């Protein structure tokens, strides 16, 4: 399929473009948005830029369905929180909702329309076995995983295998450390998060905006968890753009970067948010990152691959360049997460594993 001259990533940068498209082209954009879980956020964006009323009726109805899905998921998350609280309070006094669930529990405008795939929590390493037993006795069961990449990701990201709640089908991922095992501070990562305690998820906590931004950047650019790459980079842009209005935000961000050292995840997040969505970055922040990182070497090798990955994730647009970019970035993620002597066996095992027949995910969840 030939890629149209205007695709979703163009609309996210300039929502007004949507009003100049035919009804069929608008429908194609919204289909792409639904595929990458951005339909609800696009609806909010259209209202924010006063273009919603100028769209075709069918497009308005489709966008409203994304908003309704978001509202239903927020209500569902509150119900899930009650189920989790019942199970976890017997094993631990507190836990943190992280990544997608943490964003939905936050009170920021950037969460409006946001849809998550899984619910992830962070617990104390010392309580992990007690928590696992409590989940098993409260209607949870381990999820069978047939995808080798997902099995490897869990192995190298300090998480238990996901759990499925037998009644609600909630999928839960329990982390006992946040940073990947090969990361410099993986065994002592408490300085990478600052907790806040909204009433909506008591007695649990969520991360403050800078901690949330950093760990989203780690997932996208260190672990290379890019299945929903466009949604995640746009979420990073939304969080950065909204919080940049707060006095002292950029100074706090650079202080945070000094603590984590040479990891380039935040740098890459800022760069691609600027390139793709025109994020306004102060000169002193740009100068800092240009001094800290070998910008030309880092970006020349990554920029084209990441832009292809973010732009053409919709299956009809996936050409050979996209597939090559996805493969190269997956290998980059493997290299970052495991020693080199394990990389070749991993690639061989992945090829063999994914050629074998496995039960479908639908069969496993039912």
Give, region by region, the residue ranges found by the protein language model:
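Conserved NTP-donor binding/palm subdomain of two-metal-ion nucleotidyltransferases/polymerases, i.e.
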Residues: 1-117, 123-366
């Amino acid at each position: 399929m030939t890629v149209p001259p205007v695709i979703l990533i163009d609309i996210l940068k300039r929502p007004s473009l949507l009003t100049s498209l035919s009804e069929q082209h608008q429908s194609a954009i919204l289909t792409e948005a639904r595929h990458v879980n951005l339909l609800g956020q696009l609806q909010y964006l259209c209202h924010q830029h006063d273009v919603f009323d100028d769209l075709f009726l069918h497009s308005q109805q489709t966008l409203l369905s994304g908003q309704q899905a978001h509202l239903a998921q927020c209500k569902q998350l509150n119900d899930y929180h009650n189920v989790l609280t019942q199970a976890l309070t017997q094993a631990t006094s507190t836990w943190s909702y992280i990544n997608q669930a943490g964003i939905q529990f936050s009170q920021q405008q950037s969460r409006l329309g946001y849809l998550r795939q899984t619910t992830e929590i962070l617990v104390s390493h010392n309580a992990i076995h007690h928590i696992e037993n409590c989940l098993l006795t409260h209607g949870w069961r381990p999820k069978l995983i047939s995808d080798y990449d997902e099995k490897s990701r869990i192995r190298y990201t300090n998480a238990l295998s996901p759990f499925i709640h037998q009644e609600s089908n909630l999928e839960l991922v329990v982390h006992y450390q946040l940073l990947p095992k090969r990361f410099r501070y993986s065994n002592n990562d408490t300085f990478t998060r600052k907790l806040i305690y909204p009433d909506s998820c008591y007695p649990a906590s969520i991360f403050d905006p800078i901690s949330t931004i950093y760990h989203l950047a780690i997932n996208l650019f260190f672990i290379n968890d890019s299945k929903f790459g466009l949604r995640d980079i746009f979420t990073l842009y939304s969080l950065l753009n909204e919080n940049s209005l707060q006095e002292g935000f950029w100074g706090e961000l650079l202080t945070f970067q000094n603590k984590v050292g040479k990891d380039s995840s935040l740098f890459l997040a800022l760069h691609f948010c600027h390139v793709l969505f025109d994020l306004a970055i102060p000169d002193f922040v740009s100068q800092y990152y240009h001094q800290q990182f070998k910008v030309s070497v880092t970006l020349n090798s990554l920029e084209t691959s990441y832009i292809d990955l973010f732009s053409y994730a919709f299956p009809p647009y996936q050409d050979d360049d996209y597939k090559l970019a996805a493969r190269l970035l997956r290998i980059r993620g493997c290299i970052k997460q495991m020693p080199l002597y394990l990389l070749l066996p991993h690639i061989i095992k992945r090829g063999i594993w994914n050629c074998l027949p496995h039960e479908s995910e639908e069969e496993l969840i039912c």
